[in-house]
Amino acid sequence: MAQLETRTEPMVVNFGPHHPSMHGVLRLVVTLDGEDVVDCEPVIGYLHRGMEKIAENRTNVMFVPYVSRMDYAAGMFYEAIVVNAPERLANIKVPKRASYIRAIMLELNRIANHLLWLGPFLADVGAQTPFFYIFREREMIYDLWEAATGQRLINNNYFRIGGVACDLPWGWLEKCKDFCDWFGPKIDEYEKLITNNPIFRRRIEGLGVIGKEQAINWSLSGPMLRAAGVPWDLRKVDHYECYDDFEWDIAWEKEGDCYARYRVRIEEMRQSLKILRQACEMIPGGPTENLEAQRTVEGKKGDLSGFDYQYVAKKVAPTFKIPNGELYTRLESGKGEIGVFIQGNNDVTPWRFKIRAADSNNLQILPHILKGAKVADIMAILGSIDVIMGSVDR
């Protein structure tokens, strides 16, 4: 009896750009052999707005409000890197108090970034409840930002060349300490719900494995790199702002899979709390209300009126000219290394302003770790990378 010969043809499927699990306007052209992924081609650019060219046609002071729109989950990080570049090029020194305020804002943003990653990632793999919990914690960070900057999520416009826009309001540091005390047990709550949940672990363990050498060769950074066994954190490596004053540990794992990336981000939130507590205690001058009272007693020529106790150095004029020269500066955001290459020509606008987005680099490895995976695992692997298409496309 003749037997029927069966043969399957590869099938091409489009994921996105309008798909509820795509984390933005990302399109994946996926080639499938049954349930297995044979190839994947990311199509980007749907959210391109020419941010680098905008930067080259604006003064640096004018460009700061733009950058938080690139990554709405990491607005403070982009504000920091955009002011750090001309500061280093022009050798502008930042007061110690301003540096501490910056570090506090950056660590709050790191926690907010990881929370906004955690909720949708868990929803992608089928755990809906924690998605609603994360907004409870983010709301408290929004309140702290609103009290200090006037804005809650994006367009904080708080960082300035030479420092920050204004000092912390009265009672703000105490509220920040209260948040740290309140948020610590919430991380424990997440871990009880998620970390050792057998369904969650079976769903993501062993998915999207990235080796140590592979992570380095693909220029990955942030949790993607540290989850692959490379304990590399720019806060330790580059010694920027005042991070050398704090005691904290680099969060890293060896497995390189989706579960390792989850563990790294959970531990990073704990380390951020440790940094926040130390910064609130060690900030030069202490709480604003105490600092102002002591200045009144000492007078204008007292020690607490010195440079390191100010929230900003000499305020930069709107006509501030970027000196001749070029440099690349970088910092560690919640997603990894973000950097700016700036080239000045003694003009109010930079001649070249190149932005390196962490999630843009991290996304490049997606086709390679998807090959051989099941179609149902695509969203889990993509979600573990943590991409925001505004900064990928710029």
Curated annotation (Swiss-Prot):
What is any one of the record's Gene Ontology cellular component terms? plasma membrane-derived thylakoid membrane
Subcellular localization is given as: Cellular thylakoid membrane
Q: Which reaction does it catalyse?
A: a plastoquinone + NADH + (n+1) H(+)(in) = a plastoquinol + NAD(+) + n H(+)(out); a plastoquinone + NADPH + (n+1) H(+)(in) = a plastoquinol + NADP(+) + n H(+)(out)
Any Pfam family = Complex1_49kDa
- Annotated EC: 7.1.1.-
GO biological process terms on file: photosynthesis, light reaction
Question: Its principal location?
Answer: membrane
Q: Which UniProt keywords apply?
A: Membrane, NAD, NADP, Plastoquinone, Quinone, Thylakoid, Translocase, Transport
Q: How does it sit in the membrane?
A: Peripheral membrane protein
What PROSITE patterns does the annotation carry?
A: COMPLEX1_49K
Family the UniProt entry places it in: Belongs to the complex I 49 kDa subunit family.
Subunit-level organization: NDH-1 can be composed of about 15 different subunits; different subcomplexes with different compositions have been identified which probably have different functions.
Kindly provide the name given to this protein in its UniProt entry. NAD(P)H-quinone oxidoreductase subunit H
**Organism field:** Prochlorococcus marinus (strain NATL1A)
